Amino acid sequence: MIYMPHWPKPLGRRPKDFSLERMKSFLSKLGNPEKKMPPAIHIAGTNGKGSTLSFMRYIMQSAGYKVHAYTSPHLVNFNERIVVAGSHVDDNELYSLLEECRSAIADQPITLFEAATIAAFLVFSRHEADVTLIEVGMGGRLDATNVIDNPILTIITSIALDHMEYLGPTVETIAGEKAGIMKHNVPCVIASQEKSIMNTLEQYAVNKKSPLYRGGFEWNCSKQLSVIQVANTGIQQKNEWIPASCAGARMIFQSAIQSIEFPLPSLKGDHQIINAGNAIAACSILSGKYGFDIGEEDITSGLQHTYWPARLELIKEGNLISLLPKDWQLFLDGAHNNDGARVLADWVKDNFAEGIYMIFGVTRNRNVEEFLEHFKPYIKLLCAVCVKSEPKATDTGLIREGANNIGINAIECESIGDAILNHILKAPIQNVKTILICGSLFLARDFAMENN
């Protein structure tokens, strides 16, 4: 498997001309593969688009369908970005695809994401599948993936402030960019949003004549606790963390025509119930409008078997895990913006109110204090690390200083392994046995490399 492809070399900066004309020109030279792919579902949003895509992928696979999928970024291997009929693209085919792109594009400048998108569209156009799931890289309107003219469905997940230097200073302007994936007369599933965000999306939908299926209006998905209640917020059982919600909790999906209970999804956190709702809503449209045969049992199986790494992932083995006592736990999460921090902190509050150790690293454009403020009551020790796989990483000294400014005990560490072995395991803190690694998906990549 390939960590980074041989071509193109990263430009080190984003191009100034955010236009789709360059992408359209490149694709034209390659025979317009974007017009020859299996039916496409296009997914945008600030948070939750990868999880929503994964839920859909596993649900549809459970129903017997072949699914192509394109996501970004990758954690360890570049091949992770391109799933061809259920399997990661193999090294030889990926190499050939990129060589084909390079030959057609010649010496014209191209970003890594643009090249990956073109390679994905090429391979999807050459392999049979029933549906193609495509995740937007950033924004929507001018994203390289938005050369798809005729998706059968679009989805917009949770919207929040992120990448403001590119997408705009307010959630409303960002929503407008996300709405750019809406297409004329193509239905759009929208996660529950703040009122001003939903209003913006509705205005764009009117202009596009795009029928909306809105969370909180046409559908709703929420956790339902059974009569059995658990006094504490989490149970320790055989050294395995089990959330209190598993003790009798389920989720219920409701629309104008149905109200169905499902088990909680495999991905942890209440926010994943919303993402699962996005996927169920989308599947109901696929069944009702396009004739896909997706039953309740397929949804149940898909939700329970979905795997999407670094989303509140409990890591059970590896070099670093072997350092921990048996009753300790380590969770890995790619949360990197303020909204992601908020929902992650809610999960910590619900399950580990006694406190956690945090290993934290971010890229330079992130507000350290704003992110960490959500976790202030729970962090007993913060280990600041530099994100090694990201050239634009924040210096550990700045992280430590930002944490100290808001009253969090923080130290600088050379690596994740150094943080665990030389600091966390030697910290004199009673009854805290949980480590959370977060701040960047690139930090999750560093962990995967160190943990082997």
Residue positions per predicted region:
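Acidic, Mg2+-coordinating active-site environments of NTP-dependent enzymes
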Residues: 108, 128-131, 135, 151-257, ...
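Short functional linear segments
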Residues: 1-45, 52-54, 58-63, 70
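N-terminal phosphate/diphosphate-binding loop that engages ATP/GTP or pyrophosphate donors
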Residues: 34-35, 39-41, 51-103
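Short internal beta-strands
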Residues: 70, 187-192, 358-361, 380-388
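Active-site-proximal loop/hinge segments that shape catalytic or ion-binding/gating pockets
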Residues: 440
